[in-house]
């Protein structure tokens, strides 16, 4: 993400549910920005899966809100939109017979603001690479997030390397496994994730 800053594109962070996309954007990257002089007020963050931001599922609401803050200012701003697949399509208020307005339309528009850098996350079947390239009309960078590699997994757990590898080989590299202390908890966690992905994302 650091390398893609201010390249004029929408940065689209994709990957399977719970693989760490939101953590990468709203924790790791946000902390990096704050440590490098960006003020908290310069980071506009929305979580479309939470009730507090539900009105911003409407692309026109989000666009108007962001423009009201960014356009009059000389400051540089970062826009984070988490879980873009929760966004709505809305009727075109200027042409009732026209195509509905989508989040892609709003973000393509906001991307043109010279003092705004746009980042979004998404995790379902609508966020495939070919769809991203089509919907953003070539104005996006896809940043693909995968589950942890064994090297990343071992750097977190430490200890006996062979034992860590056996755990990794059996349970995989989903980051949330690291916080589950027992085998039963790990299994239940993976079952719940499977059900969530199957029901919500496929």
Language-model-detected regions and their locations in the chain:
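Interdomain hinge/linker elements that couple catalytic modules in large macromolecular machines
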Residues: 147-202
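Conserved Walker B catalytic segment
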Residues: 80, 85-119
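Walker A/P-loop
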Residues: 22
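P-loop (Walker A) phosphate-binding loop of NTP-binding proteins
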Residues: 16
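Short regulatory helix/loop adjacent to the ATP-binding pocket of P-loop NTPases
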Residues: 125-141, 157-158
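Hydrophobic anchor at the beta1->P-loop junction of P-loop NTPases
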Residues: 13
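Pre-Walker A adenine-sensing motif
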Residues: 1-8
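Short glycine-rich substrate-engagement loop in P-loop NTPases that contacts/grips substrate
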Residues: 44-75
